[in-house]
Amino acid sequence: MGLIDISVKPQTEQCSEVLRTAGRLGYTAVAIPPESADECMSLEGDGIPRLYRRGYVEASTRRDVRRAAEKLAGVVDFIVVKPLTLEAARYAAANKRVHIIRVDGSNLWAADRGTAEIMAQRGWGALEVSLRNLTLNPGSPAAWRALAVVLRRSFAYGVHVFLASDAEEPHELWSPYSGASLAALLGVPWSHAMLYNSEERLRILLDASRA
């Protein structure tokens, strides 16, 4: 099974080291922002995972989501929206140009049954949750709670979730197996938790969005 870190944000001078470290951790692919694409995609050789360009936007209204999706379409491989209001969350879940909805401690309401039902009606979609807060502050109850809520709700509602490191430097990367173990610790079955870094799940989203 191919494994992907759905969000890596290396500084220009760190690109090679971050990507090679990701490869050593077992990732076959990583997703990077467009501004890192020129530098990172020029790297070749053994140990460099496949690269996806990820678009990311924070949106408060339907109009924000629509405009961002139209602007990013064709420039990136997939689009992630962090909704700042319930209106934006519902529209992002229905918009066929938006692949993934990002959820953290500030918008846990977006990972609800309503979002899941809209994605089910559309036929595809996923959530994304970052491990970065735990990386920077592993003792934070809020960071643990946010992760637990997203993982448990997504499992209960049947919505796929991607774990993202948001790593800027090599030491901020998580092994996919460590991420799965963390999810299992929070109550997700191990076999399901291993899918949180599945590149195949991303490909399914990309194929569905083109259909």
UniProtKB/Swiss-Prot annotation:
Catalysed reactions, as listed in the record: Endonucleolytic cleavage of RNA, removing 5'-extranucleotides from tRNA precursor
Subunit structure: Consists of a catalytic RNA component and at least 4-5 protein subunits.
Localization, UniProt: Cytoplasm
E.C. numbers: 3.1.26.5
Gene symbol of the encoding locus: rnp3
InterPro entries: Pol/histidinol_Pase-like (IPR016195), RNase_P_comp-3_arc (IPR023539), RNase_P_p30 (IPR002738)
Chief place where the protein resides: cytoplasm
Protein name (record): Ribonuclease P protein component 3
SUPFAM superfamilies in alphabetical order: PHP domain-like
Function: Part of ribonuclease P, a protein complex that generates mature tRNA molecules by cleaving their 5'-ends.
GO terms assigned for molecular function: ribonuclease P activity
TM region(s), chain numbering: none
Keywords: Cytoplasm, Endonuclease, Hydrolase, Nuclease, tRNA processing
GO biological process terms on file: tRNA 5'-leader removal
Highest taxon listed in the record's lineage: Archaea
Family: Belongs to the eukaryotic/archaeal RNase P protein component 3 family.
A Pfam family reported for this protein in Swiss-Prot or TrEMBL: RNase_P_p30
GO cellular component, one term: cytoplasm
